[in-house]
Every structure is written in structure tokens, then in C-alpha cells.
Amino acid sequence: MAFEERIGQGGHILFWQPEDKFRINSKQILGMDLDWTIIKPIRGKIHPIDENDCEFIVKDTEISRIKHKIDNGYKFVIFTNQGGLLDADKNKSDKKMGLIGFKNRWVNIYKKLQEEHNIHSVYLIVSLYNDFNRKPCTGMWEFMEFQLNDNIKVQKDKSFYVGDMAGRKGDHSSGDLLFALNVGTQFQVPEVFYSDSKLSSNFTSVLIKDVYKNDKIFNGAKYIKEFDKNISRSNKKITDDITNILLDANTNNKQYLVLFIGK
């Protein structure tokens, strides 16, 4: 059980799978964010300072909700943006956890899930760069579905994604909500998932209104700029044009219709 990396057209993926006997392929996915959805720093900071700085965000009885889903046939996959790890490795003086610390921390988390909660079947997918794998872009989900699920078609309407960044007041982004919307799956925030509360029919609609009210609108221009590094020169003018449109729309509150036609 070691971390693996893939570099493809959509960018860079870091991922981890359990040993063979615990691997599951399923039509139904329980996707979750990692930080502040499953774990949090012990010392009260927003970001962990080392590999030992984490604890589960809820009590044991609530963590058992994850095992219940796995026992009912769900594939449990964690999708996490970790763009700060490489910056931390470059700036050692910042006292932030780097990539090696993150990997060691994950080993500690998985060991606790196994020993304390009897949860063995866990997949971890990590985005390290501002490319098409970074949430709310859908690259990590697509990698899971087409590379780690034996080509089984996922029933997105029966799957769901749980994350804390929902565009609410106090959330620093709406990335988790928008990730679920882009994927086309159901969305829950951690406090709803762990309490097994019934969702109102307009739950997502209310959150979307909060995204605009709290100015948590996603700016996709930086993702396309990052992706520019990996595309051919013949396609660069196209992405430059799209980037300018996104910047104009985001800055000046304009609306554009962009059609992408494949062949």
C-alpha cells in the first residue's frame, strides 16, 4: 500500500489504494473531503503543522456512519485538494506540513480507521496543482470512475459527496458544493451526514444562493492558465480566449455562453 502518481492530459494525480482484499468496485460512491470533514488539526489551527497534528472531527459513533455505507455497498473515496504541500516543501520556515508529512499523516489516519473503526476499504485521491484535477473541477472523480473502479458506470444520482466548503457564511470557498454539482452527484455537509439528518428538498438550492450572497463564486481562469503549461501551441490561443472571457465575467459580472464541441 503505497502512494502512486499519474500525469495525464488533465494534470497530476496522487492516489492511494488499500490492499487487494479490501478493494471495492461499485455503482454507488461515498465521496468525502478530508480536512474539516473527516479530520481536523489538534491544536486549533486551520492547517496541520505536522503529520501527528490531526484527530477525527466527530465521535466514534458518528464515524460509524462511514462504515455503514461501506457495508451497504458504497465505495468510500476521499477527494482532497492539497496545493499547499509543495509550497510548504519549498518554504521550510513556514512550519507547515509538506508532502512527506502528508503521506505519513495519511498512514496514521488509515491505521486509526482500521484499528478503531474497522474501516479498511478506503481510497484517497489528491490534487497537488491548479489543474483540472483540483476541486471543483472533476478530474479526480473521473480518475476514480475510469481508473479505480473496473470501468463500472457510477450511478451519480444514488452517490453523494460530503464536504465542508459549501459557500456558507464562514466557509472560505464553495469548492465542495461546486465539485458535487459539476460531478452531478448529491451533496451533503458533514454535520448533516454524521447526524443522518433528513435533507429538505431545496437544500442544495439554498446553498447555491449562499454562494452568491457570500461572494464565494468560483473563478476558473487560474485553472486554465495552469493547464496552459501542458497543451500544444496550436491550442493555446483557444485557451487564452477562454481565460480572458472567464476573467471578464468574474471581474465585471458579465454573462457569456461558451460552447465546447468535441470530435
Each model region followed by its residue ranges:
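Hydrophobic helix-cap positions at the C-terminus of alpha-helices
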Residues: 66-69, 113, 144, 148, ...
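Short catalytic/ligand-binding loop motif for oxyanion handling, primarily in non-cytosolic enzymes
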Residues: 85-89, 132-134, 168-170, 196-197
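Alpha-helical substrate-recognition element adjacent to the catalytic core
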Residues: 2-131, 252-263
